[in-house]
Amino acid sequence: IKFRNPQLEELSVSFSISGFFAIDSSSVKFDLSRYPWSVPQQGVGGIKLHTMYDLLREVPRMCLITGHEERDQTFMEDYPYEKGCLYIMDKAYMKTKGLFTIEEAKAFFIVPIKRNVKYLVLKDDTKHDNPIEVMADRTIEFTSRWAKAGYPKNLRLVTYYVEEKGKAMQFLTNNFKLPAEKVALLYKYRWNIEVFFKWIKQHLRINSFYGTSANAMMIQIYTAFTAYCILALAADAMSYKGSLYDFANMISVSLTEKVYVRDLIDRYQEMSEDKGDPLLPSLFDF
């Protein structure tokens, strides 16, 4: 699949970063009476989808299904990190040993620092010509025994004022070449994986299940992920610019009517141009 995000593609070229990935999880809750094998949490059952999402191509790279009782950071040391790529996570993944696994893979990460983490400032790299939102840019090292044992090398800590939230946020990264404002900008792209989770839950029906066994549930979820990737591949091959949801609807028409998908796409795009805008916002526009 070709790159779909020109801003990230530009950053990839400018700073020699091979790829950008968001890592996050999403829970699916269900009734314990129908799924008694699930470990109860607050009176309900559930599963968790641990996902690595390709931000450049806007497709999932991998998905691991576990019980919803598993912590997000449990599998940090098992993800297939690639040399030269950058991984963006929320503070649930602030596990020093897991972050050092990314460092050892010669990859990069961006993650918000937790409030209770103790560190020593080694160097202040804040530049006077930084955007006003950049409050500080420092080189630090962990000082607590457990944190330093997990991550013994120096790190970069960027403090950035987020206007939308009305507060400052601090981001840890092992990339010392990116401008401080780009570190904060890249963290915003983590939202794309949330959009992906919302999309598959709404349109590929993974909130209700046909079977009640754990195996049946996993088959349905992995089928949904596979269907999403196939749709994305087909849309990319045909240079389709509309929403993936509309593309899926067009594919369903071609199952009952003998018509080329290319003709359906041309017909839809003509309708969209007549109306001024696509009928639905594109997932790939986020």
Language model feature labels by segment:
Residues 3, 15-19, 23-33, 42-286:
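Single, function-defining residue in the core of a domain
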Residues 9-14:
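Short boundary motifs at domain starts and secondary-structure transition points
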Residues 38:
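A glycine- and small-aliphatic-rich helix-loop capping segment at beta-alpha/alpha-beta transitions
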Residues 1-2, 7:
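Positively charged, amphipathic N-terminal segments that serve as targeting/anchoring signals
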